[in-house]
């Protein structure tokens, strides 16, 4: 039994394809869009089309960009000898917000995940290796601290160390303001492993 006209059902289905959006949220988004003034809906649709039509991947790092190379890769003030490897373009935004990293990035566009059938050839590892031109001194692996992220980090270390590149991993552990009693064993172990002198 259909509750909505076909056009509304189709819009709900399209919204539900977005990550983290279930059917109920897709319904709410659809109803919100239908209640917007026509000009706002057209502006939203135009912005989607323009972004999809003009945004591409940087040929150097794989980040989203409207110029090639991207603003980070083409910035002469960035340290090109320091490359931070991340899983997705959104991870670059997280790193940049910290304002502590002045190197460049490499986006893998995924991780090695045997459970999902994703091997090393499924992500941008060849491109990473091709960037090791003698000028890169250190690669910081900033994949997520889960099984797939750790497996990917270990694989990157294995393929880059023979090239004479220093490979480091971002530290993991207790968040600032966190209590030890609420930390799980793996987090505590990582915090101990990543300890440093004060």
UniProtKB/Swiss-Prot annotation:
One of its GO terms (molecular function) is zinc ion binding. It comes from the Bacteria. GO terms for biological process: DNA recombination; DNA repair. Keywords: DNA damage, DNA recombination, DNA repair, Metal-binding, Zinc, Zinc-finger. A zinc finger (C4-type) spans 58-73. InterPro entries: DNA_Rcmb_RecR, Rcmb_RecR, Rcmb_RecR_Znf, TOPRIM_dom, TOPRIM_RecR. Residues 81-175 form the Toprim domain. Belongs to the RecR family. May play a role in DNA repair. It seems to be involved in an RecBC-independent recombinational process of DNA repair. It may act with RecF and RecO. This is Recombination protein RecR. It comes from Clostridium acetobutylicum (strain ATCC 824 / DSM 792 / JCM 1419 / IAM 19013 / LMG 5710 / NBRC 13948 / NRRL B-527 / VKM B-1787 / 2291 / W). The lineage of its organism: Bacteria, Bacillati, Bacillota, Clostridia, Eubacteriales.
């Amino acid at each position: 039994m259909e509750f909505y006209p076909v056009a509304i059902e189709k819009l709900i289905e399209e919204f539900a394809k977005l990550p983290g959006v279930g059917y109920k949220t897709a319904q709410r988004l659809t109803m919100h869009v239908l209640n917007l003034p026509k000009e706002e809906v057209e502006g939203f649709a135009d912005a989607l089309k323009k972004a999809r039509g003009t945004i591409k991947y940087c040929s150097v790092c794989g980040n989203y960009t409207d110029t090639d190379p991207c603003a980070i890769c083409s910035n002469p003030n960035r340290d090109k000898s320091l490359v931070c490897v991340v899983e997705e373009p959104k991870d670059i935004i997280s790193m940049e917000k910290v304002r502590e990293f002045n190197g460049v990035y490499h986006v893998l566009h995924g991780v090695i995940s045997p459970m999902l059938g994703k091997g090393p050839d499924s992500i941008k590892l060849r491109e990473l290796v091709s960037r090791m031109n003698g000028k890169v001194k250190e690669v910081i692996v900033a994949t997520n601290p889960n099984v797939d992220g750790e497996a990917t980090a270990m694989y990157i270390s294995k393929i880059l160390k023979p090239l004479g590149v220093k490979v480091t991993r971002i530290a993991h552990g207790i968040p600032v303001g966190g209590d030890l009693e609420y930390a799980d064993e793996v987090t505590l172990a990582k915090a101990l492993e990543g300890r440093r002198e004060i």
